[in-house]
Design a protein with these regions (language model features):
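12-transmembrane solute porter fold
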Residues: 19-36, 41-45, 56, 60-65, ...
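Small-residue hotspots
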Residues: 93, 100, 116, 123, ...
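Hydrophobic transmembrane-helix bundles of small-molecule transporters
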Residues: 152, 160, 174-286, 293
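Glycine/proline-centered helix-kink
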Residues: 158-170, 229, 298-299, 416-424
Length: 478
C-alpha cells in the first residue's frame, strides 16, 4: 500500500505570484545540471584521453555512462519524489552532485571518472521530475491552473544549457584543465541547496518509516527496467552488426517486467496505467521521436560540419548556436500558449520543413547559408518540448506525476540512443554529403509520420488549462 505519513498544516500561498522568481530559481538551476553535464564533457574528452592514455571508445563511456544512468534514474527519482516528498529528493540529488564535483576533481583514473559520471547522472536526474511534482502541488495548493509559463521556463533552461554546455566546457578546460568540468558542479550544487532552503517550502508530508517506505518502492521493477534499457541500448548500438541474443534478452526482460508490473500493487512502471492512459503513452512515443530528430541534428550535423566542409569545432559550434538559441526562445514562447494540440501540429510541420531544408545542403554551401538552412530546426524543438511537457502535466495522474515526468525524460534519452545508433549506421567511418542527405530523408519520413499521427490524435486537448485546479494529494510536497 502507500507510505504511512504524518500530515502537518502549512500556510497556503496565494495564487498570485505562486510561480515567481524565488520559487522558480532553484527549480531551474537544478533542472539545468543534467543537460549541461551531458554536453559540457564533449570538449574535455581529448584532454581526458591524453591524461589517462585512453582510446576514443574508452572515453566514450563518460558520455554513455551519464545517458544510461539518467534514463534509469529519472523515473526512479520521480517515484521516490511521489513517495518521500519532492523537496527531500531534490535536495538529495543536489548533495550527490556536490559529492560528484569533489570526486571528479580528484579522480585518479578513467574508471573512477566513469563512476563519477554515473553519480552525476543519479544526482542530476532528481531535479526535473521533482520540479514537476513541486509545480503540480504548488498549483493544487494555490488553486492555480496549470503553470504553463513555469513549464516553459523549465524547457528553456534545459534547451539553453544544452546549447552553451559545449562552449562552457571548452572555457573551463582552457582555464583550469578538464577537472574544472567536474569541479564546477560543487558551487552550482551548493548554490542550489541554499536556494532550496531559502525559497522552497518544506514537504507537507513525512514518511513514517523506512520499512513502510520500502514497501512503496518497487526495487525489482527498477532492476528489471534498468536491465531492459541496458540490453535494448546495447542492441541499438550494434545495428551495423545486430546482436540478436541481446535483443532476445531485452524482449525477455520486457515480458518479465510487464508480468511483474501487472501483479504488483505499486509497480515502478505502471503498465496498467499506461495501457489505460493511451494519451500519455502516445505522448512518450511522440516525445521520443522528436528527440530522435533533435539529437540527430545535435550530433550528426556537427560531425558533418567538421568532416564534410572541414570547419573547426569552434566554427561548427557557432554555426549551430543560432539554432539552439532559437530552440530555447521558442520554448519560452511556448509557455505563453494555452493550447497543446495546435503547438504540436505546428511543431511537427516545422520539423518536416526543417528536414526538407537539410536535403539542400552540401559541403560547398556557404557558412551563412548553412546557418539559415538549419535555423528552422530550432523553432519546433522548443515548441514541441514545451507542449509535450504540458501534455504529461495534464495527462498523468496527480499521485504519479513525478514518475510520469521521469519517464518523459527517459523517452528523451531513448531517442538520443536511437539517434546515436542511426548516425553510426548512416555515416559509417566518416560523415559525407550522401550520409547527411540520407539522414535528412529519414527525418523527412519520420516528421511526416509525426504530422499525420498528431493531426489524427483527437485525445490531445486544444485547451491545456484544466477547468478546475487539481486537489493536493496526500503526501505531496509544496
Amino acid at each position: 500500500m502507500g507510505v504511512a505519513i504524518e500530515t502537518t498544516v502549512v500556510e497556503t500561498p496565494s495564487a498570485k505570484g505562486s510561480f515567481g522568481f524565488r520559487f522558480m530559481a532553484p527549480l531551474c538551476l537544478g533542472s539545468m545540471l543534467n543537460p549541461v553535464n551531458s554536453t559540457m564533457i564533449s570538449t574535455a574528452l581529448v584532454a581526458i584521453a591524453r591524461d589517462f592514455q585512453a582510446t576514443v571508445a574508452e572515453t566514450g563511456l563518460l558520455i554513455g555512462g551519464l545517458y544510461i544512468t539518467s534514463a534509469i534514474a529519472q523515473p526512479t527519482m520521480g517515484r521516490l519524489a511521489d513517495r518521500l516528498g519532492a523537496r527531500r529528493v531534490f535536495l538529495a540529488g543536489l548533495y550527490l552532485v556536490a559529492l560528484a564535483g569533489v570526486a571528479g576533481t580528484f579522480a585518479p583514473s578513467l574508471r573512477a571518472l566513469i563512476w563519477v559520471r554515473v553519480l552525476l547522472g543519479v544526482g542530476t536526474s532528481a531535479a526535473y521530475p521533482t520540479a514537476m511534482r513541486i509545480l503540480r502541488n504548488r498549483a493544487a495548493q494555490t488553486g492555480s491552473v496549470e503553470p504553463r509559463m513555469a513549464l516553459g521556463i523549465l524547457s528553456m533552461c534545459a534547451l539553453s544549457t544544452v546549447a552553451i554546455g559545449a562552449a562552457l566546457g571548452g572555457i573551463l578546460t582552457g582555464l583550469g584543465g578538464w577537472r574544472m568540468v567536474f569541479t564546477v558542479n560543487l558551487p552550482l550544487a551548493l548554490l542550489g541547496i541554499l536556494l532550496v532552503f531559502l525559497w522552497i517550502p518544506e514537504d507537507e508530508a513525512k514518511p513514517a518509516g523506512l520499512r513502510k517506505l520500502a514497501q512503496g518502492v518497487d526495487v525489482l521493477g527498477i532492476v528489471l527496467f534498468a536491465g531492459l534499457l541496458l540490453t535494448g541500448m546495447f542492441f541499438l548500438m550494434s545495428l551495423g552488426h545486430p546482436n540478436w541474443p541481446m535483443l532476445a534478452v531485452s524482449v525477455l526482460l520486457g515480458f518479465v517486467l510487464t508480468r511483474h508490473s501487472l501483479r504488483t500493487k505499486q509497480p515502478f512502471l505502471n503498465i496498467r496505467m499506461l495501457g489505460s492512459n493511451i494519451p500519455l503513452s502516445v505522448t512518450y512515443l511522440r516525445y521520443g521521436a522528436t528527440n530522435l530528430m533533435m539529437y540527430c541534428m545535435l550530433y550528426g550535423f556537427s560531425q558533418w560540419l567538421q568532416s564534410g566542409p572541414g570547419y573547426s569545432s569552434t566554427k561548427a559550434g557557432l554555426i549551430t548556436l543560432p539554432m539552439s538559441a532559437l530552440a530555447a526562445l521558442s520554448a519560452l514562447a511556448g509557455g505563453r500558449m494555452k493550447s497543446i494540440r495546435n503547438p504540436l501540429i505546428f511543431g511537427t510541420l516545422g520539423f518536416l520543413f526543417a528536414a526538407g531544408c537539410i536535403v539542400l545542403i552540401t559541403s560547398g554551401t556557404a557558412a551563412s547559408l548553412l546557418v539559415l538552412l538549419v535555423l528552422p530546426f530550432g523553432l519546433p524543438q522548443g515548441i514541441c518540448s514545451n507542449a509535450n511537457q504540458a501534455a504529461v502535466y495534464v495527462q498523468a495522474p496527480h499521485e504519479e506525476v513525478g514518475t510520469a515526468a521521469g519517464l518523459l525524460r527517459t523517452s528523451q534519452y531513448v531517442g538520443a540512443i536511437v539517434a546515436s545508433s542511426l548516425l553510426g549506421l548512416l555515416f559509417g567511418k566518416h560523415p559525407t554529403d550522401h550520409g547527411m542527405h540520407t539522414l535528412a530523408w529519414v527525418m523527412v519520413v519520420l516528421s511526416a509520420a509525426l504530422v499525420i499521427a498528431t493531426v489524427a490524435d483527437r485525445t490531445l486537448p486544444c485547451e491545456a488549462l484544466p477547468r478546475e485546479a487539481p486537489q493536493p494529494a496526500v503526501g505531496a510536497s509544496t
